[in-house]
Amino acid sequence: MATKFPAFNQGLAQDPTTRRIWYGIATAHDFESHDGMTEEKLYQKLFSTHFGHLAIIALWVAGNLFHIAWQGNFEQFVLDPTHVRPIAHAIWDPHFGSGITEAMTQAGADGPVNIAYSGLYHWWYTIGMRTNEQLFQASIFMSILACWTLFAGWLHLQPKFRPSLAWFKNNESRLNHHLAVLFGFSSIAWTGHLVHVAIPESRGIHVGWDNWLTVLPHPAGLTPFFTLNWGAYAQNPDSLEQVFGTAEGAGTAIFTFLGGLHPQSEALWLTDIAHHHIAIGTVFIIAGHMYRNTFGIGHSLKEITEAHNTRHPLDPHKGSFGINHDGLYETVTNSLHFQLGLALAALGVATSLVAQHMGALPSYAFIARDYTTQSALYTHHQYIAMFLMVGAFAHGAIFFVRDYDPELNKDNVLARVLGTKEALISHLSWVTMILGFHTLGIYVHNDVVVAFGNPEKQILIEPVFAQFVQAAQGKMMYGFNALLSDPTSAASVAANSLPGNHYWMDLINRQDALSAFLPIGPADFLVHHAIALGLHTTALILIKGALDARGTKLIPDKKDLGYAFPCDGPGRGGTCDSSSWDAMYLAMFWALNLIAWVTFYWHWKHLAIWQGNVAQFNESGTYLMGWFRDYLWLNSAQLINGYNPFGVNSLSVWAWMFLFGHLVWATGFMFLISWRGYWQELIETLVWAHQRTPIANLVGWRDKPVALSIVQARLVGLAHFTIGNILTFGAFVIASTSGKFG
């Protein structure tokens, strides 16, 4: 008999119903639950999947490079980066009539093309690429890299090349390798590229394979390095009049501390970026020599964690926190879910910071003036951050169900957190209620008084504390005279005593959207608290799901039921919606809600500044109808008109996606609201009809059709809700911004 899917779970493969297909898909990547899985095999399989992941990334990068080199307009963009709209790729579509063909033939192309809003053109331009040939070469290199990493993944599954479990659990060596080699060396290597290729290109000096060994990146060569005269590398920076990409106004410095933006490219100074990378690379290389290596040199992580407790004779909290970090070393070492949770949380925070800083401190030349790209990149990175953060809590909960050992962690910080979960959860609950009632109350009050013609009766609160923080960083307009905004303060005196010119105060006090700190008022105050509500509610649901994963008063044996379980069986009334999986599922809706508010805020505030109409956000952002009418409705107008009875324009694809996104989103509710019985009856009706329909009934199947379980239907519903939500808002952001600014 042929092997039935899933091959990795023979118990499931014997299931006579369609359930085996869905459970097979659900557990395909849950290696821990597969037949014959050992801890060593689990680590080896995961290690190999990392190489597969790298191959996919390399292939994706190669595809972007190849299509832009083949069908894009990179060389034209290089000649005039502020006016040439970058092309992502050509479109060949049999559905296109003459109207849409004409509308999509744009940016100087011969036929229909898509415009690129990825920022790739700006990045490649900034790092010194200038020709299509260079893009093709990079594409070939990335394709070879993809093949190489795929081979590495396959190789490490072969018996001779499988690393041992002890190798995977050698924490100190892994940390040293990741810190010094992966982070440290790659940062230094990137500095090398910036200094040897990107900075010369930004000054009109071409460096290629033909001359890179003969063009000195700095007139003094390595002499200042070996004579410890490192300051020489910071002397003679580019002038404020430098024309990016040319020798006009160019200097010779390679590592600077100028601060602010290059006046023409409106991006961070490349020499500042190079300085950042060499500094951080050096720090990481030092950090990579911190932990105990094979020769016994360095610190033991176990000793560090166990010394970090309240039994130290000089500790003022002696004994009051239990035994703090004892047992944590073994717990983290032996739990992949704990490690993954930590990694996802760290990467989630970093990704959200990337979103913020790509707008506040743009690092790529001329990208700050490509408003659609800036909006798309902000939105993209915030949504990615949301998924990573929810994933962090999900794996934290799985850790508590599958990997947590109460004996090993007795009275340490993990046990203490579990022991005080009621206080943690109730405080978070209280915070969300305070935030929710007050914020909504003020918004609704303002709506009512505006609706009745008394806008002057709105409750408008100046964000004085946030304004003070901005003033401390040097924002002059509020008149606070604090730290950097007070020329006589110790901070200002210290800043002014640094040798050379510095431009961060100019950046902070700019009058346009590129100011590092945009002016804030009552509308910002309100939306800040709405976002705080979203953050705290999402956190509440996720933290409760993780802390309650092992058991609650209602279900004391929850840990035995696993991470996801339905309302399961007799005598279990009222146990629906109580698995940790349910918490993750519910938190996703709040997280999507939250990221919508975050991106609405960023996008509308920037649209208003870019259009020279700051008052629109400041005045309409203080009541809900202002948001609905002057942001959502007003900016949907062009979108809805992408195609109409009178013809189409280049926004039509986004108009269609906006419509389709709403459809996908709404489909989610069909799965979310109706429960199992409905689907079972529907399926049985369809099967009955199929079996009685001539010709159709020639097709049969062996599996008995069984409806989706509650958990499965929720997953299908959540997937549609999420994808529809993102499709809708993505189309909205791109079309509403590009419709205004081209």
Swiss-Prot record:
Give UniProt keywords alphabetically. 4Fe-4S, Chlorophyll, Chromophore, Electron transport, Iron, Iron-sulfur, Magnesium, Membrane, Metal-binding, Oxidoreductase, Photosynthesis, Photosystem I, Thylakoid, Transmembrane, Transmembrane helix, Transport
The entry lists its GO molecular-function terms as: 4 iron, 4 sulfur cluster binding; chlorophyll binding; electron transfer activity; magnesium ion binding; oxidoreductase activity
The record gives the membrane topology as: Multi-pass membrane protein
Q: Which residues bind phylloquinone?
A: W679
Q: Give the residues the record marks as binding [4Fe-4S] cluster.
A: C567, C576
Which Gene Ontology cellular-component terms appear in the entry?
photosystem I; plasma membrane-derived thylakoid membrane
Gene Ontology biological-process annotations: photosynthesis
Q: Show the stretches that span the lipid bilayer.
A: 46-69, 135-158, 175-199, 273-291, 336-359, 375-401, 423-445, 525-543, 583-604, 651-673, 715-735
Which positions does UniProt annotate for divinyl chlorophyll a B3 binding?
Answer: M670, Y678
Q: Name the catalysed reactions.
A: reduced [plastocyanin] + hnu + oxidized [2Fe-2S]-[ferredoxin] = oxidized [plastocyanin] + reduced [2Fe-2S]-[ferredoxin]
Q: Where in the cell is it found?
A: Cellular thylakoid membrane
Q: How is the cofactor bound?
A: PSI electron transfer chain: 5 divinyl chlorophyll a, 1 divinyl chlorophyll a', 2 phylloquinones and 3 4Fe-4S clusters. PSI core antenna: 90 divinyl chlorophyll a, 22 carotenoids, 3 phospholipids and 1 galactolipid. P700 is a divinyl chlorophyll a/divinyl chlorophyll a' dimer, A0 is one or more divinyl chlorophyll a, A1 is one or both phylloquinones and FX is a shared 4Fe-4S iron-sulfur center.
The record ties this protein, via Pfam families, to:
PsaA_PsaB
Which Gene3D superfamilies does UniProt cross-reference here?
Photosystem I PsaA/PsaB
Q: What is its main location?
A: membrane
Subunit structure of this entry? The PsaA/B heterodimer binds the P700 divinyl chlorophyll special pair and subsequent electron acceptors. PSI consists of a core antenna complex that captures photons, and an electron transfer chain that converts photonic excitation into a charge separation. The cyanobacterial PSI reaction center is composed of one copy each of PsaA,B,C,D,E,F,I,J,K,L,M and X, and forms trimeric complexes.
Check the record and name the HAMAP family matching this protein: PSI_PsaB
Q: What does this protein do?
A: PsaA and PsaB bind P700, the primary electron donor of photosystem I (PSI), as well as the electron acceptors A0, A1 and FX. PSI is a plastocyanin/cytochrome c6-ferredoxin oxidoreductase, converting photonic excitation into a charge separation, which transfers an electron from the donor P700 chlorophyll pair to the spectroscopically characterized acceptors A0, A1, FX, FA and FB in turn. Oxidized P700 is reduced on the lumenal side of the thylakoid membrane by plastocyanin or cytochrome c6.
Family note: Belongs to the PsaA/PsaB family.
Q: Check the record and name the NCBIfam families matching this protein.
A: psaB
Write down what this protein is called: Photosystem I P700 chlorophyll a apoprotein A2
